[in-house]
Amino acid sequence: MTWMLMVSCLLAVLYVGAAIWALRGLPESISAMVYVLPEGGARWLWTIWLWLVSLGTLIPVIDLLAMRGCEIVGFATMCCLVFCGAMPIFMKEHKRAHDALGIAGGLLSQACVACLAGGWSGWLWLWLLWPLLMASTLIRPRGWLGRLLQGRGCTVAEILCYVTVIGSASLAIATMTACP
């Protein structure tokens, strides 16, 4: 499991870094870049990678969340990522459903952290993050926040989702291996 976690972390860093490097800046949606790949093998490879990341890292998180009675949050996060990964195979072009699943995966992954952290600090982080993501995707804020995000809330959600899923999985693995 630790090997799978390290491979998932490396692939997430490489994928996000390659997306930012290829576009010379933050793309509107990192996972939406899969739609510029040729149909067939490249899209299947991306789908398999996202499935490996979600299934390989979220299963220990769900086990740990089950101890707190919040396993449905981890399961919903995993479902969002699995369906988001499969969409480029079945859809010919970028759709809003893909963005919605990406944002849902990002928010649900933060809810996993809030459940694992316990106490008020984890939930405070989640409720501070929610308006930021919604403002960056729906409202188009003005001022410095608008210039910074420029409607790139999907990118913010995806990066948070990758980092959080991998981070919470490492926390879950560390917690389970520390228990006798």
Q: What kind of region is each of these model predictions?
A:
Residues M1-I62:
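N-terminal topogenic module of multi-pass integral membrane proteins
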Residues M1-L5, L58-I72, A111-W125, A174-P180:
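Helix-coil boundary and interhelical linker segments in multi-pass alpha-helical membrane proteins
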Residues M4-A12, W46-V53, C70-C80, G105, ...:
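Hydrophobic alpha-helical transmembrane segments of polytopic
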Residues L10-G17, I48-L58, L107-A117, L132-M134, ...:
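Hydrophobic cores of alpha-helical transmembrane segments in multi-pass inner/ER membrane proteins
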Residues L14-R24, V82-I89, L133-I139:
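Transmembrane alpha-helical segments that form the membrane-embedded catalytic/substrate-channel core
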Residues P38-E39, I62-C70, M91-A97, G119-S121, ...:
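Membrane-interface helix-boundary motifs at transmembrane edges
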Residues E71-W130:
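Membrane-proximal helix-loop-helix units in multi-pass membrane proteins
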Residues G118-P180:
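Terminal transmembrane helical module of multi-pass membrane proteins
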